[in-house]
């Protein structure tokens, strides 16, 4: 389409699916390549993954791709091999309904990547601090900084995979409900 839409990534998927491509079958939504990791807790803040999840909500196969490099001029050529392989598998073998794949590609040369790992999301957090700064006009703003802390010591998660030079694939779903939390509330709250 010749129209340009400037919206949030999930909104772009909705506009494409229900307006631009409304009479067409969509084989796959590929979102990204994001500059920076969307592994572990970072998936919650990700526009790239929100677009993929939006597709999955409507049972359209969807994948969010991220390169673990925040440099806007990052070298992307080595990602082609993995994007092609993953997309080919998704088209030929499918993705379960309501599931989006979260793919993170290490920022290393193709020769150093050991392969692809299917894994789960790591249990990690950001311990944030905020720097108070001033823009050129003297206005205050805050810049979030902090340390990424991986509490997950398993070898079956995305953080381990990326750290050990693997491309990680985590199947993600929209439902963030906690069965354990719901059970606790049902047993202990008097509402």
Regions found by a protein language model. Name each.
Residues 96, 106-191:
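C-terminal accessory domains and tails appended to enzymatic cores
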Residues 1-5:
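Short, small-residue-biased leader/transition segments that mark boundaries at the very start
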Residues 20-26:
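Glycine-rich phosphate-binding loop signature in dinucleotide/nucleotide-binding domains
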